[in-house]
Every structure is written in C-alpha cells, then in structure tokens.
From Swiss-Prot:
This is Phospho-N-acetylmuramoyl-pentapeptide-transferase. The keyword Disulfide bond does not apply. It is a multi-pass membrane protein. It comes from Rhizorhabdus wittichii (strain DSM 6014 / CCUG 31198 / JCM 15750 / NBRC 105917 / EY 4224 / RW1). Its EC number is 2.7.8.13. Its cofactor is Mg(2+).
Amino acid sequence: MLYLIAEQLGFPGVLNLIRYITFRAGAAALTALFIGLIIGPRFIGWLRIRQGKGQPIRADGPQTHLSKVGTPTMGGLMILISVMLSLLLWMDLGNRYVWACIGVTLGFGLIGFMDDYDKVKKRSTKGVSGKARLLGEFLIAGLASWLIVSGNGTQLYVPFYNGPVIDLGPFYVVFAAFVIVAFGNAVNLTDGLDGLAIMPVVIASLAFFVIAYLVGNAKFAQYLGIPHVPGAGDLTILTAAIIGGGLAFLWFNAPPAAVFMGDTGSLALGGALGVISVVAHHEIVLAIVGGLFVMETISVILQVFFYKRTGKRIFRMAPIHHHFEQLGWSEPTVVIRFWIISFVLALAGLATLKLR
C-alpha cells in the first residue's frame, strides 16, 4: 500500500527509501515483529478463554506432554495477522506473485483453522479428514501454480547445474502444486514440540530472503547462473515478514509454550515457503534448506510403511522428534539440536547457489 502511494507521488524526499526492496523488507520484519509482540498477550488470553481446555494432547505421546494440557492452539492466527498487516503496508500489491503467495498462505491457514477448530470442538486429536484437507490444499496450490507458471516458465532447475535440466511443460503445474502441499504438511508434522517448527521456518525464510533477492536481480542471477525472475525480489518482503512474525510468536511459544501455532500456522507457513520456492524456481533447494521438515516427513512415511509390512516400528515413535524424546532427550535438547541441524542445512542450501 505504501509502495503504491509513494509511486503515485513520485517517491519524493524520504519516501524514496520505499523504492528499495531492502528497506521495505527490513520495515516489514520490524512491523510484523512489533504487531506480534503487541497483540500476543491479549490474543493468547482470548484463545484461552474461548478454548477452555486448549489443544487436545495425544494420550499415547510422551508422558512429559501431559503438562501441556490447557495450552491454547490456533496461535498461527497471531502470525497471520502480523504478517498480513505488514505485507499490506510494505509489499508492491501490483505484483501478481504477491497475490499467489498471499492466496496460498491464507488458504492453507483457513484449512488449518478448520482442522484446529474441529479438534478443539470434538476434544480429539483428529480433525478434518485427511482426504478433505488434501483436496482443499491441492485446489489452492494448483490455482496458485497456474497463476505463477503463466508468466514464469515451466523449466526445472536443480542444484549444482547451470541452467534448466528439463522443461516440464503443463506437468509443471502438478509438480509445483505437489511441492507446495508437501511442504505445508511437512512443517505441520514437525510442529510437535515447543518452538520446534517456528525457528526452522524462520531460518528457511532467511535463506529464501537471500534467494528471492538474488533471483529478482538480473545481474546477480546472471553472475550466479541461476534463473532470473522479474518481480521475485518482492518476495523478500514476505520472507522478512514471516521472520518478524515468527520471532514474535517464538516469544510466546518458547518452552514452556503459552500457545501452540496449530495447523493454522504450520500449514500456512509451510505453504508460503513452498510457493516462494516455486516462484523462485528453487524447489529442489527448498528440500535442502528445509531438510529438517523433509526428515520429519520421511520418518513418518517409513514408520507407517514398515509397520504395515512387518508389524514392527523403526522408531519408538514418529515423527522422529518424538523418537528422541523416548530415548531420554529432554524437549529443549531435541528442539535446540534440531534448530542447529536446520541452520546447517540452510547454509548448505545457500552454498548451492555458487557451486555450479
């Protein structure tokens, strides 16, 4: 909004700063951070009153989790409010990529909200059916992918290789939708401990802040041999807002958590990262940067597959963060070590930009 106003005025005086993506990104991060910190206490109090007993806790989970009974969920709404208000202020709302990303983020957030609401209402750990959720997610992701692809090409790029490896043509829409849905659910699976999911989301957003900026700059893209996507630079503002809103949420989600983000937040944030990677043509790099989320997802797939085939479990409990809890690791130990893994993987993902 401010960008369009300043543009109409010709960027006079101090408003010339708004012309620069880096300035707007920094402002977006701070705006989301302060909004989250300001609304947090009252919002959490309101959730606690409305939900009563809070998020249902799995009876078959680690016994230490029973102390979390009564903690409200749907804290992802707090993140979405702070991020969206920040975006409305600082993003170029004339950029269609912006609306594709906002659509996925809010759409996935709505599906997550419906799931959280169902769980709280039924006092059950099972919400909306998996098939209904996936159908809604693929419809949203498919529409966004079609909007992106219509002016962004259908080439697939992979790390360590200069230039596209294949043109997927119309199948790119299916591939892109799969990436968005898969990553949304991967973040959702990871959100099982206080602070576990949100910090890796912040770290991945920081990595894609760099990637989106480089992809959106013709000179940097040519120098690094990565795809140049005009307009993608504005997605740095979205990643910055997620960083700010995520850190504000972590203030209240740090152990012992005062609120859980729920599916409302995890699906929305995972979907946002997925669609950003599609716009930037760095979908494979997302699997490296967000490798922690991939690891959590694979642990669940392997657990289910081997249990159905052999009747035995590979892990004591899945997702894998619960396995380490069952081995005797304390919750903060699991969380911090997984943060470290996430940071290392983000650095590895960024390194692929130069190694070609």
